[in-house]
Amino acid sequence: MKFTEPAVLPPRKTSEKLLMGPGPSNADARVLRAMSEPMLGHLDPDFLEIMNETRELLKYVFQTENELTMAMPGTGSAGMEAAYANTVLPGMKVIVCVHGVFGQRMTDVASRYGAEVVRVESPMGRPIDPEALAKAIKENPDAKIVGIVHAETSTGVLQPMEEIAKLVHDAGMFLLVDCVTSLGGVEVPVDKLAFDMTYSGTQKCLNCPPGLAPLTVSKRMGEWIKNRPTPVKNWYLDLNMIMRYWGEDRFYHHTAPINMTYALNEALRIILEEGIENRWERHWANARRFWAALETMGMKLVVEEKYRLPSLTTYYTPEGVDEAKVRKYLMDKYKIEIGGGLGELKGKIHRVGLMGVNASPAKMTLLTAALCDAFDAQGYKCDAAAALAALSD
């Protein structure tokens, strides 16, 4: 069989855009330069040293001493898959807290590995009520795992974790935590609250291209995985093998994403230079200013202030405004990307990411002015001067 040779392709058409949606976020220029450094072999001593350094930097960002800390190949969804692939046995009872689309996704993933899933639910835009979890634990004392989303990307809810963690550990269960939209933007208290497995993604508050899933595992969780009675059903995400590659053995399991690891290493160096606590405070300070600007514009925010995530803000679009047309206007005129709603909030809200380098006064000013213009184009009038003034208060 003869195949037609493709025509000479034109140059790729890409342009700089301001990514202020739910992710990916813009990467720092230093991170992009790091990706272009010379390729090394995945067992080259120089690359193994970069892996070691990256692990230590991840421990700093996760605020943990867990030795089982690594960057899994794949996006944040691979982190979720790894968490449940390694911990779930067929027929095991797993409690999953669902307060948005990504909690729902947890139930799907756990079910595919044979879990009997018990759902603890709250409405989208609200956190999980510890009393509801306590009830589920009491009714299901044989459950082994509790899974929860720390930062629900579909709603912008930051889940309070102190009571949740205590309930889980008092019951002798393992706690699996999704921190895809919180790591690097808000405190992720892995050791303080004894999270057993915590995973994230590189493309949000870490300001790195998508492709790796930072993951950290407690000692007791690691021992359980090591001694599980049956092999992990997902060969590629089997932590028993991957841990040996990231550990002293340097056991070959897969070819690591070499240049993505360079990028993550550089992104984590930038965080270290700023200081993790300074970074958290910057996200909080800028988010509060942006919330004030939105309220000045007449926007109703989805989440009650005490449960808002600083790295992702959600608001209802005004009556009579087509939210998709607003997003298209921002992209066409300003090259700014923001997100729409998911699930039951589709068509009703916008999701705006203030992540890493994009959590800055200059970028919030540009976005706020552009939003006022986009709303005005649909006949919704807001006081742009007042909104911009609110950013500086």
Task: Identify the function of each model-found stretch.
Residues 344, 348-393:
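PLP-dependent enzyme catalytic core of the Aspartate aminotransferase-like
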Residues 26-27, 203-292, 296:
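Active-site C-terminal subdomain of aminotransferase-like
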Residues 127-184, 197, 205:
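Active-site phosphate-binding strand-loop segment of PLP-dependent enzymes
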Residues 16-72, 77:
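A glycine-/small-polar-enriched, mobile loop at the entrance of the PLP active site in fold-type I
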Residues 55-58, 65-95, 99, 103-108:
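Conserved beta-loop-alpha segment that forms the PLP phosphate-binding cup at the N-terminus of a helix
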Residues 300-333:
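Conserved PLP-binding catalytic core of the aspartate aminotransferase-like
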Residues 191-203:
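Conserved active-site segment immediately N-terminal to the catalytic lysine
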